[in-house]
Curated annotation (Swiss-Prot):
Its EC number is 6.1.1.1. A motif ('HIGH' region) lies at residues 94-103. This is Tyrosine--tRNA ligase, mitochondrial. Gene3D superfamilies: HUPs, RNA-binding S4 domain, Tyrosyl-Transfer RNA Synthetase. It is found in: Mitochondrion matrix. Present with 996 molecules/cell in log phase SD medium.
Amino acid sequence: MLELRSCSNLVNSSRRLVPLVTYSGLSAITLPKSRFYSQPSALEVQGTSDSRSDNILDELKQRGLVSQVSQPESFLRTKLNGNDKIKLYCGVDPTAQSLHLGNLVPLMVLLHFYVKGHDIVTVIGGATGKVGDPSGRKTERDVMENDIRQSNVASISQQLQRFFKNGLEYYRNRCALTEDVPSGKYTPRNNFNWWKDIKMLDFLADFGRHIRVQSMLARDSISSRLQTKNGLGFNEFTYQVLQAYDFYHLYKEENVTIQVGGNDQWGNITAGIDLINRIQPIKNKGLPFGITVPLLTTATGEKFGKSAGNAVFIDPSINTAYDVYQFFYNTLDADVPKFLKIFTFLNSSEIKKIVETHIKSPSLRYGQTLLAKEVTDMLYGVGSGSDSEALSNIIFGRYDGTLSAAKLVDLCKKARILQYADREIDLIKLICKLVNCSVSEARRKLSQGSVYLHHSKSKVNENISNLAPFLIDDRVLILRIGKQKCFIIEMR
């Protein structure tokens, strides 16, 4: 199952303004190489398919979305080349309130299949979440209260449905497709719905004989924990059995033949394949397969999806479209080509042109801007990227005066950054209110020329008792203090 991260300590840190920093040009960077992703030079962006008819497995590999495929891979390729419709799934345990950006990589695999006519299933671990997956962990998880788990299940269900709905809309818009072009079918599932009726003795009698303890002990997630001081609880030891049965159940009841997960899920996925092959006659259904995605890291070696030590979440109640836009806008130059391949449906020729344009003037952040707009559109709906770009331009001093006050208020409310003030307030008091400083400190900021009003390039050096001339449509004031603080205020 996908690992989620705690949503605590996020809101304040993720919304702060991130100052622009200067990165070296792409032409001077040697991008990281691995067997998952290879980039000999910034200009050699190759491999993403320009055709919907090309083998989807090859395209996913070329985009850096595939790490391992269970054997025989040739059989899977034959099915895909024959235009057979397949059904695949990915599981998520409700260990946090929201999915984070790092969870998107396996979900992008499902999305690629989905938009090209294949059926997909997501399984939320309402049952397995009670047990806890030891994969990739050195210690056992803390026990979660049942009501919190149920709340997480409900939240994640909405996030998954929103992701595939918006993702399909984004794909159709990006590829200029009409709605009559068929996609696959999306089916959400909760494994509690089948586990609640299974009795332990019946399960052991029917399935225990097909599960080999020697294979369980040999898996990395188990063997590594057995070497630690605290060892491994029986609950976590049996987790792979539960996930294996999930795959078997979906294979038998819903004709699901592929499970997708992170690299740390390889042992759990192959456990399911082993169980299916031992129980279910292969002649009745297609072979079961597993596909894993690589752990995505940045050019600096950090886990992708982190911002100042906190994960960036896709739940709009936690992180807004503007938050996600800013996260991708601050992508390192070296990561732009890779992230364009993984998180967008841009084809190879489009990505190559973007990179070439970016190299000419890296300081303009052309590549980051397009990346941020594409991902924001995919996650929050088409148009969210352009809105976030417009808001970013205002906040970072690039406002051209074309947006109405009503549009500004709407954008800022969605980003949850709109401030309010009495229209009779003078500038000194307004500065004190916004930055929580003394009157003398506010006067000092004015005298130093650190204060700007509206989108004027001229500095304000003295107190202003009447701010009406600086309002947009007699309603909104833009106040900048220094290089990193910008406030958009609705005057009432």
